[in-house]
């Protein structure tokens, strides 16, 4: 019937409007997320040869990178938050903020100590008063580079470090435990 067709068209238009609203919100959230991560070009200024490969599967992502420097130490982080979509994207913001606090404010620069402190803060921050166990967390690689001393330090939480040298790839495994 004609009334049924009108109702279906209105319902489809309503769904289309809601879909567009959600997509606009997700795209805006993605631009905020990228602003939080910082400029790739600003990070790459610190390295003669380098690149950042960031190819999220969804509009907003649980993947993130982070960079900070404390005196002669350059700290680089690559992370993957558990989950997908918006919840994982929110975890990236939490991870970014906690790394700023741990490294830039508290001046913790050793990758293993950064992971320990991050783990503690995420567990405390996400603890549920009802005693319900949460499954939120991150897999992460952290490298601290001191070019003057020609030293690189690594720690990983379920993520390895890949070293490419003379067309060879070496893998250094991280721990089996995630953050959180």
Predicted regions and their residues:
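… and, occasionally, acidic/histidine-rich disordered N-termini of signaling adaptors
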Residues: 11-180
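Short, small-residue-biased leader/transition segments that mark boundaries at the very start
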Residues: 1-7
